[in-house]
From Swiss-Prot:
Matching Pfam families: Pro_racemase
MF GO annotations: 4-hydroxyproline epimerase activity
Name assigned to this protein: Protein Maqu_2141
Organism, scientific name: Marinobacter nauticus (strain ATCC 700491 / DSM 11845 / VT8) (Marinobacter aquaeolei)
Lineage: Bacteria, Pseudomonadati, Pseudomonadota, Gammaproteobacteria, Pseudomonadales
Role played: Displays neither proline racemase activity nor trans-4-hydroxy-L-proline (t4LHyp) epimerase activity nor t3LHyp dehydratase activity.
InterPro entries according to UniProt: Pro_racemase_fam
Family according to the record: Belongs to the proline racemase family.
Amino acid sequence: MKPELTIQLMDTHAGGDVSRIVTGGIDLLPGDTVRAQMEYLRDDADGLRKLLLEEPYGIPEMSVDLLVPATDPRAAAGYIIMEVMGYPIYSGSNTICTATAVLEAGIVPKQEGKQHFMLESPAGLVNIEAIVHDGVVEAVTCEGLPSYIHTYNASINVPGIGEVAYSVAYSGGFYALVDAKSLGFDLTLDEERELARTAHAIVEAIQAARGFSHYTLGDVGPLPFLHFMGPEEKVADGYYRSRSATYVHPGVICRSTTGTGTSARLALMNYEGRIQPGDKLETVSLRDTGFIGEFTTVETEGDYQVVKNSITGKSYVIAHSDIVVNCDDPMVDCDGLHHILSSRHPQRPAT
C-alpha cells in the first residue's frame, strides 16, 4: 500500500488576499540560502505552486508561503512566496500572513504587547513587529523593500484603450503605476472585471515594448504588477488615504491593496515631493480593506532616490488543513512535485 502523501496548511488572509502557509509535508530543499531554495523550487519543483494555486486545490487569486528553516541564525524561520506570476522575492501581505502564522503555530511564542523578531525572505532578513492583545495578533508591521521610481511619467499606446500614462516603481517587483480616474475608474468592487481586463492590456503592452533592470539585482524578469491609484485625501497632518487596486499578471486583481503596491505609492509620492519621512499612506481596496505604509527614510543609490518604508496590516487565520496528494488522480499533476513531497509528520522550521 502506498503511503498517503499530505501537505499541511494554515490558510490566512490579509485584506482579503488568502495566503496558504505550508507548515509541513515538504522535504528540506537544497540551497544555502532561502533565495537559493526559492530558485530550486522555481526551476526544479514548480509543481508545488501549481498544485496549491490551481483546481482542484486552489485558485490563482491565492498565494502560497512555504515555511523553511532559516539559513540566517538571526531569523525565526524562512519563507518562500509563490503567486500566479511566479516567485516574487518579497511581498508585504504574504509577510504579514507568514508572521501571523509563525506566532499562531508557536514557532515564535506569543508575548503580550509588542514583540519583535525576524523572518528570512528570498530578499533577505525582514524585521517584524507584532502587537498581541489577549493572545490575539492584532497587527503586524513589516519592513517594505527599499523602493524607488525607475521610470516617471512615460506613455504607451495600448490596443483597445489608447494612450496611457504610467510610471514604474520597484518595491519587491516592478509596478506600473497608473491613475485610475484618467481611465474612467472609481475603484469600486463592481469594476473589478474591467480593471483586470484593462490592466492585462496595459501590462501586455509594456512587456512587449520594454524591460526593466534593478540597479543591483539586474534583470528580474518582465514587469508583473500594475497598481491603479485613486485620488489621495489628506486625512490629517502627515496622513493620507487613497483607494487603490493591484493587478498581478496574468488576470488577477488582488483582494487587498498589497504591501508592495503601497510601498510603490510611497516611492512615487516621495519622487514628486509630496511626502516626508514619518508620513503615512493608507491604501484602501475595492473591498474597503487596507494597509498603512509609513515612509521612514530616503537614501540615494546611484541615480535613484530609494525609499525605506514599513507596512502595517492584520492577518486572520481561516483554516487548518491536511490536503491529500494522490498522483494517480487525473486532476493532479505531480510533475515537478513528487520528489519534494514527504510522508513525514509536519515539522516546524528550525529556530
